[in-house]
Amino acid sequence: MKKESIYLILAFFILCAHSLYANKSVRLSSPNGKIKFSLVLDKNSPVYSVAFNKQTLIQDSPLTLTFDNGAFGENVKINKPVFSTKEETYELIVGKAKHIHSLSKEVIIPLEETVQPFRKINLVVRAFDDGIAFRYEFPKQKGWDSYIMYDEGTSFNLQGNPSVTTLFLPNYQSSHEGKYTVTDYADMDNKRLMDMPALFSFPNHVYMAITEAAVRDYAGMYLWKENGALLGKLSPKLGQERIKVEASLPHQSPWRVLMISDQIGSLIASNILTNLNEPCKIEDTSWIKPGKTTFTWWNGNVVPDTTFLGGNNFPTNKYYIDFVARNGLDYHSIYGNAEQAWYDEDGAGFGSPGPKADILKVVPSLNMQEICDYAKSQGVRIHLWTNWKPLYAKIDEAFAQFEKWGIAGMMIDFMDRDDQEMIRIQEEFLAKAAKHHLFVQFHGACKPSGLNRTYPNEFTREGTLNYEHCKWDKDTDADHDIHMPFTRLLAGATDYHLGGFRSLPRDKFKNQERNPYVMSTRCHMLAMYVVLESYLGMICDTPEAYEGQPGFEFLKAVPTTWDQTVVPNAVSYTHLTLPTKLEG
């Protein structure tokens, strides 16, 4: 009788456990207990909620995925979840801090269809003290070894009508350069593409930013409001609109990240995106040297008070190499001159290389080996601007030649996409560049996603409306700048074309291609080198604008990487105090 009772009790607990997972909820809390995640089945469909300090931010948000063999998200059961604690310490060569301690709680929630085709997908959730992240895992399984995804229906049912700060985009092919809009969520237009990160300010001074981490072999995600609901939208494969992702199993999505805090400065200092990425793939990183660089395109390749004409020639580059050397800077960039690249582009301009463009065919007026040898003799390294298309066409030959010349890195430009193919291409650039000891600076590119941990040769990305616009419009001013730390910078480094030393107030400001003006003050410009995360700081004005001028000594001394970043004082779009720290 006693033995039978034990069996009955065990059977009862097993039944209760199955019922708990199949019909009730799975819950996860951050290590400090402030952030809570829950997943339940609503009519056999998974929905999730997120709360911070008992304040609900996201409520009953559906998770559905649409594939070529049907939608996944209805007639689903929850199998037994697996809970664990994740803790690690690691170092970043380029990042917001050098020494990182990451602590999170994780649950793997197996979701399985109860009707044919009986597919299985895992929802992996991690809770940090500064946010929640989740991703979809697609394990290889009988009868399902590959997929074509039409839509990822991740949704975010916001509560409390938060204020939203976002960048609206006209379409998926974009340089991600524009003015940010601040509005209440209820008043925000439907069916407009929203870039990420987007910031949501809730009542009681609670802040949440939505972005993504570890975007690899997948399409980039955007936000989209429709019928009041906030949805994720994937960038479609080029030339059509339906297919978003194609993959063989096993496969996984990027992390969908909700950065959360009651101190907005904590979002700026957060390392959650690098925490969610794989460790460094580069065995020897001793050659990776962040630093500061010229960028003569911005100033118009100006060479005042010289006996030679500025252009695609040795004297012009020597002029700037000598400037870098005598001021203890690091890099000189070569892009070309006017609208002509340093290589044969066979096209109408930088953004439109022709079919016969050849990255290995240097224009006759330049001897790249001579320039690199001279730079080396002065303790200066060279990095090259390139359009991504001719570079990718000869990626292996080009990188080998660059290494032979002694090139340190590249600015890769005009990608303007983040569909799955372009995401793959960007990672291929990083991986192959590392084999040839080359750093990468992406321009005309999508937001970062913490991949600088895996590939620390990624120094910075553009993807912001920045000071290059001072050459043709009046959009980049201090009011625009102060939005950056609370929006795009939450995702990581940005190249902002810093360094303009010729300032004019807005009422006197004028656009000009050569020796352009900026609308910010000198002090504002200097502060941007500390506030804006970038591991390749531009010194983009002319030697004449800098040498002997107040503030240039600071530019020469300011680091491009820090050992610690804290934000003790910040008010959205008004001000912030960011005392970074460098060991020693």
Name the predicted role of every residue range:
Residues 25-281:
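N-terminal accessory beta-strand-rich subdomains and adjacent acidic, glycine-rich linkers
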Residues 574-580:
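Conserved small/polar residues in nucleotide/adenosyl-binding loops
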Residues 251-320, 327:
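An acidic-aromatic substrate-binding cleft motif
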Residues 296-300, 322-331, 338-339, 371, ...:
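Glycine-rich, acidic and aromatic/proline-enriched surface loops and short helix-turn segments
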Residues 509-572:
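Glycine-rich, aromatic-lined ligand/substrate-binding cores of catalytic
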